[in-house]
UniProtKB/Swiss-Prot annotation:
InterPro entries: Zn2-C6_fun-type_DNA-bd_sf, Zn2Cys6_DnaBD. This is Transcription factor FG08080. It comes from Gibberella zeae (strain ATCC MYA-4620 / CBS 123657 / FGSC 9075 / NRRL 31084 / PH-1). Signal peptide: none annotated. One of its GO terms (molecular function) is zinc ion binding. Induction: Highly expressed under trichothecene-producing conditions. Keywords: DNA-binding, Metal-binding, Nucleus, Transcription, Transcription regulation, Zinc.
Length: 415
């Protein structure tokens, strides 16, 4: 049951509801109790009662001798309201000076948020819930809480709830951003290149020829002797990641064209192109390291050279053994490496002098070149031809590409 009672001086001075326990009406209010302050109630002046603040003990709430009417108890707590409607919490503008005042006002209400009965519809219902300043939900009136930044995919997602804390749409956009993914790809390539330069690997285990028709194995199981480090598996995983990033970028451009949205700015495309070329040159450095290692081992280690030249599976025709040519391992290795990188070269739209793969017919893309096929891309490649490649002794990018092509030819002609 709601019963009007005078508010204490502290609650009245700060224009807040004076809330008391329903069973202890004569004790201090909840707000003064938590603040450990004296709860002084300034009753209306009566004859013979002195004015002022000298006799504070006489201004405490006297115990009520009147017996309240008998009523069925309800689970909703009884809240003591202020006797003046003019000092209730204002809604529009009183707390708009700063969000700090509004938040302090809400915290000073001493609402027991764990008591779900205070929101019960029994009794007088909504009258039992204290008013909350509307400035808490107004970004325009706040000086400390900044409004959320605009998010393009928010309205399209169908989520009409106001964002608080983290913004999942922004996190998704950052994860799917091609620029961030290309930067991550650069880090993976650098780490893989350091591993190639630091660790040795068993060529006879990694380049072992097996028949795919008899128990085809996964790439992770191809290198049993040196399972801890298989350079081909790591290289092909990076190439697959490279293809996925380029496909995401291609789909983003196509989606903008279908929706008649302005295409990506030229500055952004140039930034993507530079990062993609950097990733491609790092991948060529990985290839250069792999081919150099195989050639060095084949020239210095007789067992490796014999394995590369003579480890040919027996092939029969009508029951007769067919003499197999030499260096099947070396030529198969060179062909596989060219086939893998050819898909990346086609997706980038690289011209012939920038490619190391020789079979161009198997990677002809039906779509137009994405990054480097236009005039801007060709001009960018012309500028980069003379640039030095970091970490390589070769003088320029074109020198690196030419060196890798020569090593591929040397591996194919070991016999």
């Amino acid at each position: 049951m709601l019963k009007r009672r005078s508010a204490c001086e502290r609650c009245r001075g700060q224009k807040l509801k004076c809330i008391r326990e329903p069973d202890n009406r004569t004790d201090s209010c909840l707000r003064c109790s938590q603040a450990r302050e004296e709860c002084v109630v300034n009753l209306r002046k009566t004859p013979g009662r002195p004015s002022g603040r000298t006799n504070s003990s006489s201004r405490r709430s006297p115990p009520s001798n009147t017996t309240p009417p008998t009523q069925t108890p309800t689970p909703a707590p009884t809240l003591v309201h202020d006797d003046s409607d003019s000092i209730s919490v204002p809604r529009n503008g009183s707390f708009a000076s700063s969000s700090e005042d509004a938040l302090e006002g809400l915290l000073d209400m001493n609402i027991d948020w764990g008591d779900m009965n205070m929101f019960s519809l029994s009794g007088n219902g909504a009258d039992q819930v204290p008013e909350i300043p509307s400035s808490l939900f107004s970004f325009a009136e706040s000086t400390r809480v900044e409004p959320p930044p605009p998010c393009a995919s928010w309205s399209a997602s169908g989520d009409f709830a106001a964002p608080t804390g983290l913004f999942p749409c922004q996190i998704r956009n950052e994860i799917c951003d091609p620029g961030i993914q290309l930067s991550g790809l650069q880090q993976s390539l650098s780490k893989h290149l350091v591993q190639l330069q630091s660790f040795s690997w068993d060529i006879t285990a990694v380049l072992k020829l097996e028949s795919a028709s008899f128990g085809f194995q996964t790439p992770e199981s191809l290198c049993e002797a040196s399972r801890s480090f298989n350079p081909l598996v790591g290289t092909f995983e990076i190439i697959s990641e490279f293809e996925n990033v380029l496909e995401i970028l291609r789909n983003a451009v196509k989606r903008r064209e279908r929706q008649e949205v302005p295409t990506l700015p030229k500055e952004m495309l140039i930034c993507y192109s530079l990062t993609a070329i950097s990733c491609y040159l790092q991948l060529v450095c990985v290839y250069n390291n792999l081919f150099s290692y195989v050639l060095d081992q084949a020239s210095s280690n007789l067992a490796v050279r014999t394995f590369v030249l003579d480890s040919t599976p027996v092939i029969s025709l009508s029951g007769f053994v067919i003499p197999s040519p030499k260096n099947i391992v070396g030529r198969s290795f060179a062909q596989l490496m060219q086939h893998k990188i050819g898909s990346v070269e086609a997706a980038l739209g690289l011209p012939d002098d920038w490619r190391i793969s020789k079979d161009l017919s198997s990677h002809q893309s039906a779509d137009r070149p994405l990054l480097l096929g236009g005039k801007e891309g060709q001009a960018l490649l012309e500028l980069l031809k003379g640039q030095a490649v970091e970490g390589e002794s070769l003088s320029s990018a074109m020198g690196l590409l030419e060196s890798v092509r020569d090593k591929i030819t040397e591996i194919e002609c070991l016999a």
